[in-house]
């Protein structure tokens, strides 16, 4: 009987770190019950770890808490990769092949690997995503098994500044190895976008605290990935600097305005000493700038809005009132909110929230990658205690009772002999004489 597998994933964002454990049965059923998070400020900027020691301590605490919840030891983790410098670069590899031999998967894998042979200035390749295949200059969805004299493969190289992955490696130096790195926006796209979304054309927009990631799909393939250095914290800081209030106050005001993207229709109320209409002016202006930058990604990807059927919106900032409507009006594409991965069952209602969609997607993706028999958690095992008597003494087994003998008949009193009777009489007489002398 195959044992269940446990998968541990970590997502390090600009405002918080989230760790979670999922359980995968031999039948493929995937569920998550345990999740831990820690908020932080300024230790991660634009998705890149700045204060390694602070984040290392947070990650260590999260894993220890998860170990206590599951009663086991975390042995390895899957770590999400995202950040400001993460983006895609298109690369092509051409190869002449023998026309009498069928193209194999091994050949495809070798050609794709060749795409990483050319170094990219100041960037590391963190993933490779195939985009299109051509056999004898004719595009094909799957070249394996086909015959031809040439093959061309177009791929997306997912690259980032070296510091992004370097600092992730540095913080995971306390004894728990990284099983694999997973590009977070690609994991989310794989898990929440439908086949129809990817085929007809869609744009996945993840609006976080300090970055906004845009992934564009068309004809079932990723065609563009970019990370913008803009997010929800920009709105907060505009209110903070414009109205001279503390950041925590600006954040609370932003969250409590009924319609922050429509200043003309905001209730004229004061929140923590701040005028709601005045704050809405700053929030609306900055949000308009972020939406304009998102729209620009279609131009950079050389894609028309007519080629994109929908925008799927996720991330902490995505829940702001009125954002979906304003984005749809500006970009002229219908917008909807993303949902948690359908293949993953969240058993704890307290953590079944959209704000954890990234770590849930990492767990779902890792469940596809983990090999049979592998696990990320060693559960504690307990055996019934064996008690020993002190001093090594072992009590003997009780012996069987002996066969009872028949009770003997009571013996009759023996008749006293003549000599014994005379002796008793003499003793009595002598005792009486002694007593008389004492009385005199």
Language model: regions and residue ranges:
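Short active-site oxyanion
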Residues: 155, 310-311
